Amino acid sequence: MNFLMLRGQVPQDRDPQEIVFDKIEDCDDVWAQLLFSMLKKEDQAELWYWGGNREKKFTFNFTERWIPNFQTYKSVFIPDVIFCRGGFKEYHSVLKQFPTSFKIRYGAGRRYLPCQGFYDYDLILQDSIEQLKICKQRFPRIPSSLFIKPAPDNLFYPYPEIKKEYDICFPANGSQNFKGHAFVYNTLPPQFTLLNLGNNPHNFKYPNNVTSYRVLKSEMPKHIAKCKMGIIAVDSEIDSCPRVIAEMLACGLPIVVLDTVRFWRDKYINSLVNPKSRWATGELVTKDNFWTAVQYVLDNLNKYNPREYYKENLSLEIAAKFLREKINVLGV
């Protein structure tokens, strides 16, 4: 089977060299890792970005390409399956070029529904029950499903040798004002120490008990490991299922998530207060009891086991198996 993943645009907001890797084992992109995890020996796969010029053959059956312009590109690679990561109109010319391929769309965030210009998908993946319900109402003839967003398992795992220097990990770019900095920094109690991994917000200062800096994605796990637990507080109108949820669970950190975040709640959060399985992962809370929940998690760290839950329910292997089964059942 031939797989094609449309990955998006070569980064415009940072150095494109940050996503250049010589070995697939070093690649920090979860979507490249997911595609690679789906492959059998007899399969072939390509991953495309637009807005660049690069070809990297990672293995005998997996190639990454940066293509200057999708609209004018004529491919000799004929995909049986096309996975669209992101809901970009730039993909439409590629999708129309291969009318018989099985087309999967995972837009997420604001782009969670197909946009005008192309609707002929065979499967639409969603982050949350709310998004799935709307999608089924708008596109009742297209199969749609909830989907787990894993972490790059080649990088995100516990580092027990690293000392815990902070109570809380808050991985969120301050340049994106929907990530929750205003709420977190304006209400953070003084007894907690917090590490913010991301660009500093420009519109206000962070408290004295906050340390903030940006690291490359490949370096994040070792900085996450400096913390005892994690928090997520994004704006639900813009983002959905932030990747840091799976990444912190994969690193073994229990999490507290604001209840406005759009994600598959029952899949990621197994509460210690009301457990659904033997491995608790964290708590889903309102703004009113957010910091009370943080204190509760810190007081009960040894009762959570997010790493084991992640391996059994959220890993790359689980996500890849899910997609292969969907493809087999629905079409190819």
Residue ranges and their predicted role:
Residues 109-111, 147-158, 200-202:
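Short beta-strand->alpha-helix junction loop in the catalytic core
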Residues 26, 284-289, 296-328:
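A charged, aromatic-enriched C-terminal amphipathic alpha-helix characteristic of glycosyltransferases
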Residues 225-240, 253:
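Acidic donor-binding loop of glycosyltransferase active sites
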Residues 20-24, 31, 37, 153-155, ...:
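Conserved catalytic-core segment of nucleotide-activated headgroup transferases in glycan assembly
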Residues 132-151:
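Helix-loop-beta element that forms the nucleotide-linked donor phosphate-binding surface
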Residues 221, 245-250, 264:
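Short alpha-helical segment that forms part of, or immediately flanks, the ligand-binding pocket
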Residues 5, 43-136:
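Extended catalytic core of nucleotide-activated donor transferases of GT-like folds
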